[in-house]
């Protein structure tokens, strides 16, 4: 394989709220590449000017960045300009998928099931605004979930059980972004679907210790339970795969990625979000799903790299 003679930049760290997770993912990926005999170097984009990659003879980039400037199309557009092949989706799919509001609009235009929501911009937000929209918000019903539009890893998210706490929840979300979503909180079972190339890996059902799959449940807790196989019957699994692939193809996702879905108590699926650069930590779902498919972490990293374009 010619891949062995190449020089791979593992882009990690960065400046987003998810920097720490990116560092863990990135160094896991780096160590795996080195074990495979691949010449790879860790590049923290917080300190390293990306435009220097060609001058240092890097031939490909493995993007292990999460959040803004790494998962939002920014780094992808620079790498494309530099003519350096990179892992994951291209610029536009990355920019769309990190923006939950625009992703929802796109999916809705194809009649896919998205969780009912309201979108609010920071410049129009105040207590009077919430009063004005109280009827719209009440149509969602309590509880509701307030989240920044462009943050991952459940950062800045609050579950609101009473209207008295809604203003504070919105203020918290606005710390992290200039626009937020207020969504209907769906009680049910969450599923994550990993996609490698054009293949769907085994589906995982997520059962957090508490009601919500938050940052602690994702990265720190050992009490979150994962079921893979998911326990869905064949018909529901086929339905979920169809919805997922359609959603992924609509945003033009390529390489590898993950789509998160929740099934309510009436057995209806609702799309949550798409992730074009999933985590690769010890707690991460993508390598967990790959392992169930018989793909080791080391082989998985190689396969993702081979899909770089």
From Swiss-Prot:
Pfam families in the record: Dala_Dala_lig_C, Dala_Dala_lig_N
Signal peptide per UniProt: none
Broad class of where this protein is predominantly found: cytoplasm
Domain ATP-grasp: from-to ranges: 104-306
Annotated S-S bridges: none
Family in the record: Belongs to the D-alanine--D-alanine ligase family.
Name this protein carries in UniProt: D-alanine--D-alanine ligase
Naturally occurring in which organism (per UniProt): Buchnera aphidicola subsp. Baizongia pistaciae (strain Bp)
Gene: ddl
């Amino acid at each position: 394989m010619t891949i062995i003679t190449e020089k791979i930049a593992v882009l990690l760290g960065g400046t987003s709220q998810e920097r720490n997770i990116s560092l863990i993912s990135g160094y896991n990926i780096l160590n795996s590449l080195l074990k495979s005999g691949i010449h790879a170097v860790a590049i923290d984009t917080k300190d390293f000017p990306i435009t220097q990659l060609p001058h240092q003879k890097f031939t490909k980039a493995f993007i292990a960045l999460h959040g803004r400037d790494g998962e939002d199309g920014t780094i992808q557009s620079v790498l494309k300009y530099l003519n350096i092949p990179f892992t994951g989706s291209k610029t536009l799919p990355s920019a769309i998928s990190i923006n939950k509001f625009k992703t929802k609009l796109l999916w809705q235009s194809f009649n896919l099931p998205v969780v009912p929501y309201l979108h609010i911009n920071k410049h129009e937000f105040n207590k009077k605004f919430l009063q004005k929209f109280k009827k719209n918000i009440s149509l969602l019903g309590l509880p509701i979930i307030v989240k920044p539009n462009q943050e991952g890893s459940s950062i800045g998210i609050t579950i609101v059980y009473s209207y008295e706490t809604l203003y504070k929840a919105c203020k918290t979300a606005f710390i992290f972004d200039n626009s937020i979503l207020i969504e209907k909180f769906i009680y049910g079972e969450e599923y994550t679907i990993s996609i490698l190339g054009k293949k769907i890996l085994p589906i995982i059902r997520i059962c957090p210790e508490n009601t919500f799959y938050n940052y602690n449940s994702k990265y720190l807790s050992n009490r979150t339970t994962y079921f893979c196989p998911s326990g869905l019957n064949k018909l529901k699994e086929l339905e979920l795969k169809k919805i997922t692939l359609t959603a992924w193809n609509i945003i033009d996702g390529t390489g590898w990625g993950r789509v998160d879905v929740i099934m309510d108590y009436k057995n209806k699926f609702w799309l949550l979000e798409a992730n074009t650069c999933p985590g690769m930590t010890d707690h991460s779902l993508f390598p967990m799903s790959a392992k169930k498919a018989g793909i080791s972490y080391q082989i998985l990293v190689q396969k993702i790299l081979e899909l770089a374009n």
